[in-house]
Amino acid sequence: SAVVTEAQPRSRWLSWSLRWSWRDFRAHWVAVIAIAFVLAIGTGVYAGLGSTGEWRRQTNDASFAALEMHDLRLTLSPGTFIEQGQLLGAIESIDDADSVSAAAERLVVDSQVDTGSLGLADSVLVPARLVGMTFGSDRPVDAVWIRAGTAPSAAPADRSAVLEVKFADEHDLPTEGTILVSGGREVTYTGLGVTPEDFFYEGPEGTIFAAGELAIVYLPLAAVQDISGNEGMVNDAVITLVDGADRDSVAAQLDAAVSELGVGATVSTRDDADAVRVLYEDIDNDQRFWNA
């Protein structure tokens, strides 16, 4: 009897509380639903933005891996060139040569691009970077992703090019056409694309938003050698390493090997590339902002 008597007030209180809540809900149902809706949106947004860092990191990893972003890069001192094949020879000569998965020589030179020959209403004359590289390789390093059009073939006589896609978008340029580079040389580009190291890049004099201020043109190595007057010469090499390789040790060996060639060079890692540094730093910075 004591138990029943003690439970009845609790039961009556619960019943009264539910009736009062129901009456209050009916009187303020619009506000209640609005508050619930706002809370649901806030919870969903926080959960979504709170996890952006991980999927952005995974996306970056996949993008760099798909285009075989270099692990190490050899860059000769400005204005220095060396005979094609010598950098590859230096790479093959190091003690840990078996740690190298693939390597490619390049010729990277400054130039200018004039879009006036495209016949558009507006044309631009901007600083440019010509990247002479190998197309159609079975073991590419820093391959070109083609968004539209086609890339040059592996044929020695092919002198077509790929125009960097962000520059083309900034100036609303067509997928293919003919542009002029320094010396009035015509270059026919057949596609728009980008290499992984140019996912982000600085423009002239270190400008950050450089998409429209620097034209990057990817051409076969022989084409850039011809255009720049550096026949048979290179000044750059990019390298990928096998899984588990000691990157720092390989870099030190490469530095010593290139020094023996009698030229000044810088050995940099993929982490030194603007694209890698900025894109990954942005992840952490943005995540801290969303978390705040």
Language-model regions, residue ranges each:
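Membrane transport/envelope proteins' first extracytoplasmic loop
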Residues: 1-292
